[in-house]
Amino acid sequence: MRTVYRIFIIVISFSFFCSCNEPVVTKQEKEKADSLSIKLNSPELKALNAQLLSDPSNPDLYNKRSQLYIQYKQFEEAVGDAKRAIRLDSSVATYFITLADVYFAQNKTRQTKEVLERTAVKFPESTEALMKLSELYFIVKQYQQAIETINKALKINENIARAYYLKGSIYRESGDTSKAISSLETAVEQDNSFTDAYYDLGIIYAARKNPLAFDYFNNALRSNGTYMDASYAKAKLMQDMGKYDEAITEYQALLTKDKNYNQANYNIGAIYLDVKKDYTKAIEYFTKAIELNGEWPAAYFARGYSYAKLGDKEQASNDYKKCLSIDANFSEATIGLRELN
């Protein structure tokens, strides 16, 4: 009996020791693992695996699976498949581009650049390789190399809308807005549904408070009705041009489509505060902004200032203090508190 009891104690102790050393899996980690399991058991991946079992020397299948692995963020597997595709057939530019895509997805810009530069030399007629390389040059701010590479692509095909858009983006970042406008306009001539090009043209003209901006924002929304940034930019331009009632209407329409576009709440509040002097309405919209983002110091300050205008010193003081608890260097809130006292 004593022996049985001793064995029982040992088993209990061993079980306790094992359970104490088991790794703790958080809910987030479990959800991530479950999500990955679903992806890795997806019909697309299963179909490719089945095809590769019956045709293991097909480079195109490895390339497709590599692209799928990129989507699933399984980068080691993606690199392996891309390299297999290249080993099986090194005469296809797309396989090299897929390998570059894997490296780029991992933010490995040096390896991405090396692969794309080799690809551009090996396949000088590949506009896809040239465009990806020029985009990489743009990202790392090698603007001259980017322009030269874009021009090579345009010599092969002068109708690449993306090439003109990228040139416009480079000129815009370089401060040459005239050339930026010219390139962006060419982009929308080549592709009249190029939303980003319309939007960028709108932003350039909006900075000049030129009404032409409205046409470009409207075109962006025509090509993509869910482009909320274009709706916001349109409303902001109305506000900047003194069309306050129209701006409020546009902001409210934006919030109907996307209730979380919080800058719209703040801007409506600012119009009621600074222009219409309707402090109660201003508080209403600043409160909405705070409800969506409780760590926004400017919204607390603006609401506090509105309360101060209504003579509610206690609420004003609370908001100023909250503002400073988030950003101790928010000098306007410090001044506001001093003025209340």
PLM region descriptions:
Residues 70, 97, 104, 131, ...:
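Position-specific recognition of the canonical hydrophobic site in helix A of tetratricopeptide repeat
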Residues 1-18:
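Sec-dependent bacterial lipoprotein signal peptides
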Residues 59-60, 93-94, 127-128, 161-162, ...:
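Helix-start (N-cap) detector for alpha-helical repeat units in TPR-like alpha-solenoids
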Residues 38-47, 73-84, 106-118, 140-152, ...:
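Structural signature of tandem alpha-helical TPR/SEL1-like repeats
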